[in-house]
Amino acid sequence: MRQSPGVSRRALLQRAAALACAGAWPSGADAQALAATTPPSTPPPQGTVPAPYTPRVIDAAGAQADVALLERALKAIHPGLTRRSSAAEMDAGFSSLRASVQGPVGELDFYRELSALLALVRCSHTKAEAPAAFERWRQVHPSHVPLRFRWIEGRMVVVSCADAALPAGSEVLALNGRAVSDWMQTLGRLVSVDGHTPWARDANLADDGDLMGSGFDHFLPCVAGLPKRFELDAVRLGERGASRLSLAPLSFEDWLKLPNGSRTWRANFSEATQWRLLRPGTGYLRVGTFVNYRKPTDAQALFTRAMLDLQAQGARQLIVDLRDNGGGSDDAALALLDHLALKPYTYQRAMRLKAVRYGDLEAHIETWGDRQALFHAPLSQFIRTPEGWYERRAEDHPEHLQPRQPAAAAFGGEVVVLTGSLNASGATMVVAKLQDMGLARLVGGRCGGSADGPTAGRIFTVVLPSSGIRVRIPLVFNHMTVTRYDPRGGISPDVLVEETVEHFRAGHDEVLAQALKTLGAA
């Protein structure tokens, strides 16, 4: 992935991120090319007053032109635009967006309204990136709430805080005079998740490996501005009454240093995959992410090593922990399936595009690879369906569309998979396939994502010329080979275990306890 003239670091990052469902990940040389474009962060000198950020104002004509381009692009390209919201609902969303730009508009206000419209699509891969200058500013200037949290039983529970006066396990009731439940509802309408999965939305507000760490902090400035202090009403651990704390915001770089349990921002597959014998006869395999392009490794070899090691230790049962996994590279996801499969299987039934010709929209699309081959591919590469889809040919995409064989070291014993609300994209595809093939029992929380497949794969980045805001639009509906799924999105486990505040404070893993109970004696 050499950087060609005029291709931004954002384009390179988008290439890597968008390949998550396409199974074509950057090589080591590509990763070096990406790293070479990384600009150094320059923190403000010690003792200086942080420079304020002044949002750019976009004139009405420019904002209206951006909205018109976005509407045209979404309707021409997106294969799932009306999959979870009706055409009438989307038209109402576009009308609301147009109404918000009848006069000059600040870039953060415009970004907020764009995000609200894109969230209506109910696709986690369809979203706008924050204005680039603002994102750079936030890296080293304080704007993040100085804590990490989990949303448990409708309560904001502290995982860690920059101020020792608010220990882990404390509960935040209000932020700057407003109940945190109201903040979650307001900010939640800006978060893109698959289908009607509010549990996934809440999880992404607390943790998001794609945006600036959490949906809550990512979108808060678009609603509340940039306060110099955060006034928190909280019940500190061990106390009964609420206390008022005044906390200074953190830069994104400092916020990332806060402990966050097992969840790592932008984790890598090779580092987030561990295994051990949990008890005699029962193995444990944690796969925290399928992202395998930043530090690529041979996923097949890694899982073969894991399975052989666990079996050598006498494992006859296996717990696969996917709770923190939001998806990633297809090579890692397919390798896990290959090592759990007992017979040949086909991953997807179809890869469908809405269009393969884009007219003058091409001038506004940033992508990677051979543009001639992408925008003017021979029509013979596709099968036109009676419904109007363009389907990719199985012989051109055998890994996804043709039968796969179990790995030689595939685990042949009893399997339980631990699930959670952070599951999305490729992680949900794996869970759906395991459930459909009867290869595992699911224990834990409800998954996000789409069991019948996401709209993902290659992603076009449409650059809105007046605002400069970049919008990600997926090209492909990856239709899974599954016989049952919830059309509203997500997956319900066989044994539903919802985390409680009591268990969190005690450090008790009830999901794992229920998994061991489900397996019984090894």
List the predicted regions and their residue ranges:
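N-terminal secretory signal peptides
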Residues: M1-A11, R15-W25
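Conserved acidic, small-residue-rich alpha-beta core segments centered on
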Residues: S170, D330-R505
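Flexible, low-complexity junctional segments that flank or bridge functional domains
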Residues: R2, Q32-L318, L322-L353, G359-D370, ...
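Sec/Tat signal peptide C-region and signal peptidase I cleavage site
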Residues: G28-D30
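Short linear Ser/Thr-Pro motifs
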Residues: W25-P26, S425
